[in-house]
Amino acid sequence: MDHNGLHGFYHWMRVLQNGRQLAKAENANIKVVELFSLLHDTQRRNENYDPEHGMRAAQFARTLRGSWFDVTDTEMELLSEALIHHSEGYTDGDVTVRVCWDADRLDLGRVGIEPKPDKLCTVSARDPNILFWANARARYKA
């Protein structure tokens, strides 16, 4: 996959910014949110349909644990859940997992899709100011 493409490095950095903002507002586990942001699309095989990329990302994260980053068992479970299900449209779950999913969804503007508040998981992500901020960055790929 092209790491400069739609699911590449710049997307990961915007998801990281979104995640940090939401994690602070929602009192989520920032370490898990940051790891999710940087890992969630690393195992994509293409820019289009790749339903197993979340599972591969979770498996990849497990191989990095202990050498590239340290997390508790609980944090690893949260990270794995967020990675595995991030493309499925779920809105329920632990606040940290929901923040991860919203951080990614707030960057849909990069592909011309404006995030719909009713498809977001957290109150903070549905805030009109956050939606505007994230969507503007996504559309202009800033």
What is each model feature region?
Residues M1-A28, L39, S67, H85-A142:
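Divalent metal-dependent phosphate-bond-processing catalytic cores, especially two-metal-ion Mg2+/Mn2+ enzymes
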Residues G5, E47-P51, F69:
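Short gly/ser-rich anion-binding loops that grip negatively charged ligand groups
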Residues F9, M13-L16, E34, D73-I84:
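Short, well-structured alpha-helical segments
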Residues V15, G19, E52-W68:
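An active-site-proximal "capping" alpha-helix that borders the catalytic cofactor pocket
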Residues I30-N48, H53, A57, S80-S87, ...:
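His-Asp-centered metal-binding catalytic motifs of divalent-metal-dependent phosphohydrolases/nucleases
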Residues P51, M55, D73, E77, ...:
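Short, amphipathic alpha-helical segments
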